[in-house]
């Protein structure tokens, strides 16, 4: 028997010996149970060693903003369901001046358990800041581009080491599209709305998620 894949808050990972292994919200488990499926919870896998806690990541961002005020600015675009800040680091030669130059947006950790995303984003930020004025290619990039890096879009999911936000929604499937203007998994979540409100007014934008 196949598991319905269109249930909100359900992400099937694999199937072994007739059993489905999936990430599922409480609402998705209730819906599966109502459909006659037997569900069993397993302990949450702990975050792999070596990856920083959210507080440490935020502290690093604050430290860099203080160390490199001439080429970066830390700002907040919204909050998660649990009121955790959604932080963005802007890197450019004049962070307090609106200049006519290309804009680049880098969003990581839309899924809270994809930890390597924030790691790459944070290393990218650090490399740009510490190489500016030393590496001519990095200096040219920063001088001519308005770079915005969001290391963790889903802070609640990151803390819980969970794919979903605290409401049980997969944020990657929550954005509107031409065929689903209310989002593929409505309603729109605060993290999704924060990124949309942040992105829509921007011009000349290249994005990586």
Q: How does the language model describe each region?
A:
Residues 98-209:
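Active-site/substrate-binding loop(s) of hydrolase catalytic cores
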Residues 10, 69-73, 145:
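Short glycine-aromatic motifs
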Residues 42, 77, 150-152:
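Conserved beta-strand termini and adjacent loop/short-helix elements that scaffold enzyme active sites
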Residues 32, 83, 171:
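A residue-level signal for conserved active-site and pocket-lining positions in enzyme catalytic cores
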Residues 26-28, 36, 43, 92-93, ...:
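A mature extracytoplasmic/lumenal domain signature
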Residues 49-104:
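Soluble metallo-hydrolase cores and metallopeptidase-like ectodomains found primarily
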Residues 1-57:
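Intrinsic-disorder/low-complexity accessory segments
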